[in-house]
Amino acid sequence: MNAINSSFIVLCTLLVLLMTPALAMFYSGMVRSKNTLNTIMNCFIVFGVIALQWVVFGFSFSFGKDEGLGLVGNFENFLLEGISGYNASGVPNILFVIFQMMFALIASAIITGSLVGRIKLGVLVIFLLFWSTLVYDVLAHMIWSSEGFLLKRGSLDFAGGGVVHISSGVAGLVGALMVGARKSDDEDKNAHSIPYAFLGAILLFIGWLGFNAGSAGEMNDVAINAFIVSIISAACGFLSWVVLEWLIHKKPTILGGLSGLVAGLVGITPACGYVDIYASLVIGTLSSVFCYFGLSFIKYKLKWDDSLDAFSLHGIGGICGGIATGLFASAKVNPNVIAQNALGEGFFISGSLELLKEQIFAIVICVVLSALISFVIFKIISCFTDLRVKEEVEQKGLDVSLHGEKAYTLA
């Protein structure tokens, strides 16, 4: 065992584990007080459901051997059977399993932000269980497994721009459209605790650094690069959103700045192990700009109730990051970009369109697979029960109605 690399992955695993409760705090601060606890429950219940799914068969589907198609693994590692020894970096294989579990958790948790305030908890649990199995595990295998279909074609996704963010953002949007908009008026959709959301977002940011740097698999130059460019991209994303609000609305907001922070982090996620510092400046800025205008179009023009903007931030941001990888990927940062069977450096580095075309192809696969399977899962569930709570429950608030608790009680 390599003690340094193993300790590094343990630290990164803890940081990524922090992301799920941090996201619950971030989300719950942005809803009305009557739905605070329900939002936390929706987000954190994935810890129980998806963690167990991952141990039983999720990891095996994601990283197990397949039958040659490169689409999904088999049951060889059912209940983590056969997980022993160390990988090439001297990290215990079981530690890699748990590190990757954290990615599966946060992917499912992101989806819940699109559905706050009206979806039944049981419906959500069933959906996330099947979505994680049929979408997340399949994409993880195709893009990250050594036998994966998209990996063999040359697609690059360092830390989950497609596997985690595009897939969850698209699923959230499909769910929001199928479940329907919240019945409450615009005033009743405002954030009840911006400081609470701020704390959650900052903890999410801290965890994200382990998410991106840890994807290197060991403590090396690529991990350090991922760590640094993630911070820079987040800063650019935050500032870009604030400036846009300042120019357009004359009032920069904290929630807007936090949205820009997340957009910058999402955008750099697939690229952080492949791009140089100057590229992170561009990626963070443009991801934030595209997410800003995408959010405005979806929320105010189309009037789709993607409640906490999962698609606008994670879906659009992930797409921006995937394309940016095809533009800026550099062998100077990561020699794997020009390794055997790789497609070479990004367009702005090499002048070749090969990697960019493959990145766009992989993005389309992520969008179509997640949209189609999410629609089918929700459609099947709707044949047996309503997807959303009754209107009187929604008006009263889901905290009291579904959980018998209140987030805040005055003495």
Predicted segments, located by residue:
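Glycine- and aromatic-enriched membrane alpha-helices
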Residues: M1-A411
